[in-house]
Amino acid sequence: MKIRIAVPSKGRISEPAIRLLENAGVGLKDTVNRKLFSKTQHPQIEVMFSRAADIPEFVADGAADLGITGYDLIVERGSDVEILEDLKYGRASLVLAAPEDSTIRGPEDIPRGAVIATEFPGITENYLREHGIDAEVVELTGSTEIAPFIGVADLITDLSSTGTTLRMNHLRVIDTILESSVKLIANRESYATKSGIIEELRTGIRGVIDAEGKRLVMLNIDRKNLDRVRALMPGMTGPTVSEVLSDNGVVAVHAVVDEKEVFNLINRLKAVGARDILVVPIERIIP
């Protein structure tokens, strides 16, 4: 039984999605010629490239069994899909922003009849209804941040990762509407009828995500100092300890640690007598 996964053809979430699939063992067979459909290293999995904004609807309609796209686009489309995984990248906030010199400090200050420019009219209109705000929504397809300065709108809603673009354009966030990141989604019928292969891929993807920012630290230590090493290397469920057959009184210790802790950890390990220390990248962690 085959499945098709829709992946963004371009944009900031495209290459990370392709890289994630590759690391999960589902790399593209043809990495040079980007076509609409591409076979992968897995004989039962095919990739379909499309606009990120169209992926929620393609998955909901069954044109693709799975999809990788932003949560903001899923909500904007209102697509009936199963969200399987948060892929831990592409994080951004959909914010309501006004010019720095505006008297609007919060949603309660928005005057009746104000105009809001956005690429997300559905989410914006829902927000206005929830807050009882009588405002007009104007849909734009880009350069939303200039709308207040050319007389098109009084405010905007736009995606922001760091806030830098808003500040550069003299805009100030007055409210956060939605937190977004990239999701793995599934067609509901496909998830029921093709659960075997879908769960196989899901496990591979989750293993890659769980391994990000982790390193396997391996070392040798005299048994008499083992407890001191254990205190420094708790690992995921405790360090793995095994005998070193060629050297009496020495044991090997393995543990998974956060990458950001490695630098300081090595110095502390050496201080308690650890030697032959190896730090190894981890491709996947499968619980």
From Swiss-Prot:
Keywords: Amino-acid biosynthesis, ATP-binding, Cytoplasm, Glycosyltransferase, Histidine biosynthesis, Magnesium, Metal-binding, Nucleotide-binding, Transferase. Feedback inhibited by histidine. This is ATP phosphoribosyltransferase. Belongs to the ATP phosphoribosyltransferase family. Long subfamily. Its EC number is 2.4.2.17. It is found in: Cytoplasm. InterPro entries: ATP-PRT_HisG_long, ATP_PRibTrfase_cat, ATP_PRibTrfase_CS, ATP_PRibTrfase_HisG, HisG_C, N-reg_PII-like_a/b, N-reg_PII/ATP_PRibTrfase_C.
